[in-house]
Design a protein with these regions (language model features):
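N-terminal signal peptide c-region/cleavage motif recognized by signal peptidases
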Residues: 15-17
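Bacterial N-terminal signal peptides that target proteins for export
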Residues: 1-8
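Coil-to-beta-strand transition motifs
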Residues: 22, 37, 47-53, 174-176, ...
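A broad, structure-centric signal for solvent-exposed, well-ordered loop/edge residues
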Residues: 8, 49, 62, 104-107, ...
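Short, His- and charge-rich active-site/binding loops that engage polyanionic ligands
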Residues: 34-96
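Domain-level detector of nuclease and nuclease-like folds
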Residues: 79-234
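Extreme N-terminus nucleophile/cap motif
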Residues: 19-38
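Juxtamembrane helix-loop boundary signature in multi-pass membrane transporters
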Residues: 9-13
Length: 234
């Protein structure tokens, strides 16, 4: 099953309800550091103070009925080099703190939910994307997990070198667009791939589904190689 899923990820055309966008690849010279978190893994772009790639798995046992813990705030990650992204960098900017690995994917365990509220797992998103398009994609992935499928998930940010924008004193990079994939090894035909623009129009996840080949070709080489290598151990 794994080989079938991998072939879907990097070659076979699947979901085709597509609105064409042109994602911009992060400059290949950007430096990434690996940060192991409880039940998810971050590749953090230290040039943009923003996650380049987050990977995690999702099964029915990860899902429960816990909600965001009362008073839970986003915490600065001491594992990141200075200047570290802070929650205050987002204040009154019009951007939301968008989870890449969502807390709801760990709703069976309050401690694991809390672990997702770290700034190395957060990127600036327009509210429409964060609360609608991206949130719908997350719900779709959880619906597959509730149906007893094991899902392998990746999400990350694209930046354009000719339109760099930053937030706050920590200079948190504002992504031009985001990628997300939900890979289902036991039923590859259910796998879904998304390329989302970071704007106010990203309100329907189905509009931004793409083929696996379009997804793979949009990624920077460094990120694509990381995903391929991680998939072998998943």
């Amino acid at each position: 099953m794994k080989s079938r899923g991998l072939s879907l990820l990097f070659g076979l055309m699947i979901c085709t309800s597509v609105q064409a966008i042109s994602p911009c690849r992060t400059d290949e010279s950007d430096s990434l550091i690996r940060l192991q978190k409880p039940r998810f893994l971050v590749y953090y772009n230290i040039n943009r103070n923003c996650p380049a790639l987050v990977v995690w798995s999702l099964t029915k046992t990860d899902l429960g009925h816990h909600r965001r813990p009362a008073g839970q705030s986003f915490l600065t990650d001491p594992a990141c080099p200075r200047p570290r992204a802070k929650s205050s960098d987002f204040t009154r900017t019009g951007f939301q703190r968008g989870h890449l690995c969502p807390s709801a994917d760990r709703s069976a365990n309050v401690g694991l939910m809390r672990a997702t509220f770290v700034m190395s797992n957060v990127a600036p998103m327009y509210p429409e994307l964060n609360m609608q398009g991206f949130a719908q994609a997350e719900e779709h992935s959880r619906s597959l997990a509730w149906a007893n499928h094991r899902c392998l998930l990746v999400a990350g940010a694209f930046f354009s070198s000719d339109s760099l924008r930053y937030l706050g004193k920590s200079s948190v990079g504002i992504p031009d667009s985001f990628f997300r994939a939900c890979i289902v090894p036991d039923a590859p035909e259910l796998s879904v791939y998304w390329l989302f623009p970071n704007d106010t129009k990203a309100t329907r996840e189905a509009t931004f589904r793409v083929s696996s080949s379009a997804f793979a070709s949009s990624l920077r080489r460094k990120v694509l190689d990381i995903i391929k290598e991680l998939y072998k151990s998943w």
